[in-house]
Amino acid sequence: MKTASILGAAAASLIALAAWAEEPAGSGWYAGGAAQLVLPQGGSRMRRLGGGAARAGRYLTDSLALECEAARLEDSAALAARAVWHLHGWEEFDMLFGYERFDPFLSAGARGWMHDGQVGPSAGLGAFYYLTDDWALRFDAEATLGLDTRVETVYSISAGIQWFF
């Protein structure tokens, strides 16, 4: 319950901050879903888990977004709050060899696992592939560090779709 409260407060803070941010080119909001695979390292009751995740967020600038995620796995659930930073510098190199629909990003934040109450910092990388201006495929790889727990690190990979509105 403590983990849920902490992550809930973090998520509410991110959404409140996003509501006061300067409006980017579009409305700035997005939502999506993904299939997710979690690979824990170290000793724990956690095992390899497959499941799904739902994400929602808002762009504060053209490069920076804040998002929240809720994941339901086989025997666990997770909540996360993170910042997503898009790497627009590659545009200087001819859109990465002509792939103008490809959009790489870095992410950093916190994730909590409900089965044992652990919360830890997370970092990752990923990419969008834009199908249209409103729809994109999203691929992520993330590592979450376990603090004060037997699980040292939890790796996750996900693939899904995202809608910008």
Which functions belong to the PLM regions below?
Residues 22, 58-124, 129, 163:
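Gram-negative (and chloroplast) outer-membrane scaffold detector with strong preference
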Residues 42-48, 117-121, 149-155:
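Outer-membrane beta-barrel translocator domains and adjoining extracellular loop/strand segments
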Residues 140-142:
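C-terminal binding/interaction regions
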